[in-house]
C-alpha cells in the first residue's frame, strides 16, 4: 500500500466504509511525521462537476504542500491537475488557496498550517482549467507584453543602466495571481455598488456590482469574475510603467483611470496581504488614484 491513500471525502483511511470523519491527529513535535488529510477540490474546465477528494498520507516536517501534491499524483492519483515549475517561489505557478488563503504551494509547509485537514482550492477570479489549475490569460490580457522590459530605443540611448533590478519585469512581482484571487472586487465577494466615472457610488436604484458582474458574464462566458475591473496585478504593473516612462503618462492613465481601472478598488487591502513577494499592489493602485489625467469616460 502506498504512503498516500485516497479516501472518500470525510472518510477515515482505516475504515473508508464507515463514513465517519478522520480521527483527530495528536499533537507531535516538529521533528515527527504526522498523518494528515489533504482535501483537494476537483473539477473539470470551468469548474464543472466540482467536488472534494480526500487523501490520507504521512507528512514529514520538511514537506511542502507541493511536495505532498507530487506524492499524491505519483503514488495514488495520476489524474490530479495542478501547475508547478520552479519549486522555490520564483515562478508563481503553484499559487492556490490553502486553507482558505492564497499561498504558494512550494513554500507552504504542511505541518506549519497546524490543521489535521488541509484544504486546497484553485485561485478565484480566474477561469478553472481543471482541479487546482486556472487560466492566467485574463490577467495577462491587461499587462502589455513590453511593460517592464528595456525597449531598443532606450538601450540605444542610455546604454546598460546602473541597477539592472529596476528593469526587471514588474520588479518583484512573480505574476502568480494571488492578488487577483484575494481581491473581493475581482473574486466577486464584494457586493458594494460599482463606482461611477467620478468615483462615487451608484444610487440604490442602480444595479449592484453582483448584478453588473452577472450581466457581463452572461454576455461573455470567458469574462473573469468581475469583468469591470482589470484587477490589482495589471494596475501594479501599470504604475511601474508610469514610473519608468513618464512620457507615456496620458496613455497609461487612460487605462488606469478608465472605466475598468482604479475606481473599482474598495481598499480592502487583501491584494497586498496575499502577495508572496511584498509587491503591495494596493499602494500602486492608490498612486494611480492620486494622479491627474487619463481617461474619464
Model-derived features: positions:
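Iron-sulfur-associated redox domains of electron-transfer enzymes in respiratory
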Residues: 2-140, 164, 180, 184, ...
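Ferredoxin-type iron-sulfur electron-transfer modules in oxidoreductases and energy-metabolism complexes
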Residues: 63-78, 121-297
Amino acid at each position: 500500500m502506498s504512503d498516500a491513500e485516497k479516501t472518500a471525502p470525510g472518510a477515515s483511511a482505516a475504515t473508508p466504509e464507515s463514513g465517519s470523519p478522520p480521527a483527530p491527529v495528536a499533537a507531535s513535535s516538529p521533528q515527527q511525521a504526522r498523518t494528515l488529510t489533504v482535501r483537494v477540490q476537483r473539477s473539470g474546465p470551468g469548474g464543472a462537476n466540482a467536488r472534494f477528494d480526500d487523501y490520507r498520507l504521512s507528512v514529514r516536517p520538511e514537506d511542502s504542500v507541493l511536495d505532498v501534491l507530487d506524492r499524491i499524483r505519483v503514488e495514488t492519483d495520476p489524474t490530479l491537475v495542478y501547475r508547478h515549475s520552479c519549486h522555490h517561489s520564483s515562478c508563481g505557478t503553484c499559487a492556490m488557496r490553502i486553507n482558505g488563503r492564497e499561498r504558494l504551494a512550494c513554500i507552504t509547509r504542511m505541518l506549519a498550517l497546524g490543521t489535521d485537514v488541509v484544504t486546497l482550492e484553485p485561485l478565484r477570479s480566474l477561469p478553472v482549467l481543471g482541479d487546482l489549475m486556472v487560466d492566467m490569460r485574463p490577467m495577462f490580457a491587461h499587462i502589455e507584453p513590453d511593460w517592464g522590459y528595456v525597449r531598443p530605443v532606450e538601450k540605444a540611448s542610455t546604454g546598460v543602466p546602473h541597477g539592472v533590478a529596476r528593469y526587471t519585469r514588474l520588479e518583484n512581482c512573480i505574476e502568480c495571481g494571488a492578488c487577483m484571487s484575494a481581491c473581493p472586487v475581482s473574486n466577486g465577494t464584494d457586493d458594494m455598488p460599482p463606482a461611477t466615472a467620478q468615483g462615487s457610488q451608484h444610487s440604490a436604484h442602480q444595479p449592484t456590482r453582483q448584478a453588473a458582474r452577472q450581466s457581463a458574464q452572461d454576455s461573455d462566458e470567458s469574462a473573469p469574475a468581475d469583468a469591470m475591473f482589470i484587477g490589482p496585478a495589471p494596475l501594479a504593473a501599470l504604475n511601474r510603467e508610469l514610473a519608468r516612462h513618464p512620457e507615456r503618462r496620458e496613455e497609461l492613465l487612460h487605462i488606469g483611470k478608465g472605466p475598468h481601472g482604479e475606481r473599482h478598488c474598495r481598499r480592502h487591502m487583501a491584494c497586498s496581504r496575499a502577495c508572496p513577494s511584498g509587491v503591495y499592489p494596493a499602494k500602486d493602485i492608490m498612486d494611480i488614484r492620486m494622479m491627474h489625467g487619463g481617461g474619464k469616460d
